[in-house]
């Protein structure tokens, strides 16, 4: 009901409306963007790993979207300069590194690391912090209060955070020329 009340002013079912959704974004002082992605009313976060020794999460909703919970990925811009290499597959290596760190932080059991927003905000979430780059943690800490002003309750201290969502966009960039053709 938190999202419905923030968006509609009352639970959607009382108003004859579907579960509310949202899209939030914030541009940090350093220019890095933080945004929600793939909001799932009535959803939950599941492990969607495709490789041994890695944890990646994804959100999902059941058909009726009536579980009483909601989720979305909270993402921040990742730049090619963050990869630490100019290799064409550096983004893939970066993604795999984060997924392996999440696997280790979850006890090597394919359980994703979790914490509350309050714990991450206050630097008391070592499992989650160990599998996120410092720039991502800093960006989330800067953005969350602003996102909470856009959607009341989004930054509640008890909001759950689950790591990591690394598959929202391709880790490989194809360089193109002025005619949008692949460069060789």
Q: Which residues are covered by each model-predicted region?
A:
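Residues forming the flavin
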Residues: 1-184
């Amino acid at each position: 009901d938190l999202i419905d009340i923030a968006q509609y002013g009352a639970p959607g079912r009382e108003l004859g409306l579907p579960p509310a959704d949202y899209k939030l974004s914030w541009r940090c002082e350093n220019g890095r963007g933080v945004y929600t992605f793939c909001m799932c009313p009535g959803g939950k976060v599941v492990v969607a790993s495709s490789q041994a020794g890695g944890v990646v999460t994804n959100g999902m909703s059941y058909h009726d979207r009536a579980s009483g919970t909601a989720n979305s990925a909270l993402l921040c811009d990742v730049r090619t300069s963050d990869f630490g290499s100019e290799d064409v597959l550096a983004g893939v290596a970066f993604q795999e590194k984060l997924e392996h760190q999440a696997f280790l932080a979850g006890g090597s059991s394919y359980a994703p690391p979790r914490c509350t927003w309050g714990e991450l905000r206050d630097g008391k979430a070592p499992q989650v912090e160990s599998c996120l780059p410092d720039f991502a943690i800093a960006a989330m800490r800067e953005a969350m209060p602003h996102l909470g002003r856009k959607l009341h309750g989004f930054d509640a201290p008890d909001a759950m955070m689950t790591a990591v969502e690394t598959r929202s966009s391709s880790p490989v960039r194809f360089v193109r020329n002025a005619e949008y053709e692949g460069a060789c």
